[in-house]
Design a protein with these regions (language model features):
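Conserved AAA+ ATPase "sensor/coupling" helix adjacent to the nucleotide-binding pocket
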Residues: 110-118, 164
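Switch/connector loops and helix/strand junctions flanking conserved nucleotide-binding motifs
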Residues: 104-111, 156
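Glycine-rich phosphate-binding loop used to anchor ATP phosphates in small-molecule kinases
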Residues: 53-94, 100
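Hydrophobic anchor at the beta1->P-loop junction of P-loop NTPases
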Residues: 6
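Conserved substrate/cofactor phosphate-moiety recognition/catalytic segment
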Residues: 18-64
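Walker A/P-loop
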Residues: 15
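Small-molecule kinase domains that catalyze NTP-dependent phosphoryl transfer to phosphate-bearing small molecules
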Residues: 117-160, 168
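Walker A (P-loop) phosphate-binding loop of P-loop NTPases
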Residues: 11
Length: 168
């Protein structure tokens, strides 16, 4: 199975693109799964001695749900952590990262616009996501597909991503 990870900071547009891809990509070849869909709750890990296993467990469950199809996995997984720290399920033969990276201003606006229960109500809550976005942008040449989707519609971004995936 091939693993195509669509990553970026919170507010980058990953879940929105996933919704479009699920309608566009051939379901006999690809399964699109968002971290939020695997049924694993971050708060069961936060502050525990196994916090670092959250991403591994989400990925393992997504692989199981994909049932042998190529997996388009929407997640905030940091590519550096994926290579250096994560346990990769044996079913994964290759991994490709697609990065969504709008401007910091767009990230800020999107996070501020979210409902209060999502937790982005203070500058302190938003700052780490802006910093992660800056790190991603600084490393833009390391990804096979890097998209600044600040000025693109959801459909335009999804089309670029789908065409790239279909060409793999």
């Amino acid at each position: 199975m091939r693993l195509i990870i669509i990553t970026g900071t919170c507010g980058a547009g990953k879940s929105t693109v996933r919704d479009h891809l699920a309608k566009r990509l051939d379901p006999d070849k690809f399964v699109c799964i968002d971290t939020d869909e695997v049924g694993i709750n971050w708060w069961d890990y936060a502050g525990t001695d196994h916090e670092e296993h959250f991403s591994d467990d989400c990925l393992a469950e997504a692989v199981r749900l994909a049932n042998g199809h190529d997996l388009v996995f929407v997640s905030c997984i940091n590519p550096q952590d994926y290579i250096g720290r994560h346990t990769i399920p044996a079913e994964i033969e290759s991994t490709v990262f697609i990065v969504l990276c709008p401007t910091d201003e767009v990230i800020y606006q999107r996070l501020q616009a979210r409902p209060a229960e999502r937790g982005f109500t203070t500058e302190e809550a938003i700052r780490p996501h802006i910093e992660y976005n800056q790190w991603i942008r600084k490393n833009r040449g390391k990804y096979p597909l890097f998209i600044d989707n600040s000025e693109q519609t959801e459909e335009q971004t999804a089309t670029k991503v789908a065409e790239f995936i279909e060409g793999l």
